[in-house]
């Protein structure tokens, strides 16, 4: 039976390793801590030393860049089953490049990156898991860059709805606008236009079946 003390990391790592068990899991269990975060609470700030990796048990988070003038740009969101870390902070002496805030009341699991590296050095399944998670992170980053550089604002909104239909319902519009590189007013106009086009297509499809 799979350990359930820290289900988020267990599921994440075993799936990444392609196995139902991981050697020396007890070492990871001892290093993982569970944290409850209230809506609006901060997981970590931008510009601090924080060499930890997180897995989301429950809830929703936003990962944001904060400019000197207070302007916030949201790089991504993390919901149940997702993981996150500031890669720059995982290097010796490194600091976080962004901050993380809870959109909903949530539960997180946290582990020191050094523990993961030590396990990967000793055990091939752990090395495979970390490699696969690195690929997942890189693929997300690549997709995000492609959308920002090649899609129109409406295209980015439609792509987000297609990729994250349920998540879109949980994210405040102001946060979604900051993620898509829009103003809330601009996003509202796009959302209304998209809804009208969907309604129009649905009506046309219905009429076609009636004739």
Task: Name the predicted role of every residue range.
Residues 41-103:
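Cyclic nucleotide-binding regulatory domains
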Residues 1-36, 89:
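Cyclic nucleotide-binding regulatory module and flanking cytosolic helices
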Residues 204-211:
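Conserved small/polar residues in nucleotide/adenosyl-binding loops
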Residues 199-203:
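Short Lys/Arg-enriched helix C-cap and helix-to-coil transition segments
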Residues 101-184, 189, 193-194:
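Polybasic "coupling" helices that flank or enter modular domains
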Residues 35-37, 78, 111:
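Hydrophobic residues at beta-strand termini and immediately following loops
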Residues 33, 37, 83, 165-166, ...:
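Generic structural signal for secondary-structure transition and capping sites
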């Amino acid at each position: 039976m799979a350990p359930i003390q820290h289900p988020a990391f267990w599921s994440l790592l075993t799936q990444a390793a392609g196995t139902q068990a991981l050697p020396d899991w007890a070492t990871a269990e001892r290093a993982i801590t569970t944290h409850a975060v209230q809506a609006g609470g901060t997981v970590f700030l931008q510009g601090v030393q924080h060499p930890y990796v997180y897995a989301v048990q429950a809830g929703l988070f936003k990962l944001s860049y904060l400019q000197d003038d207070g302007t916030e740009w949201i790089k991504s969101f993390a919901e149940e089953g997702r993981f996150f870390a500031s890669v720059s902070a995982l290097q010796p002496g490194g600091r976080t490049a962004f901050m993380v805030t809870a959109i909903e009341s949530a539960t997180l699991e946290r582990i020191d990156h050094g523990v993961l590296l030590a396990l990967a050095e000793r055990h091939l399944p752990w090395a495979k898991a970390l490699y696969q998670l690195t690929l997942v992170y890189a693929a997300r980053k690549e997709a995000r860059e492609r959308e920002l550089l090649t899609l129109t604002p409406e295209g980015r909104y439609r792509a987000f709805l297609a990729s994250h239909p349920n998540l879109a319902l949980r994210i405040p519009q102001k946060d979604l606008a900051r993620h898509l590189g829009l103003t809330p007013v601009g996003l509202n106009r796009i959302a209304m236009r998209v809804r009208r086009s969907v309604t129009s297509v649905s009506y046309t499809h219905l009429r076609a079946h009636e004739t």
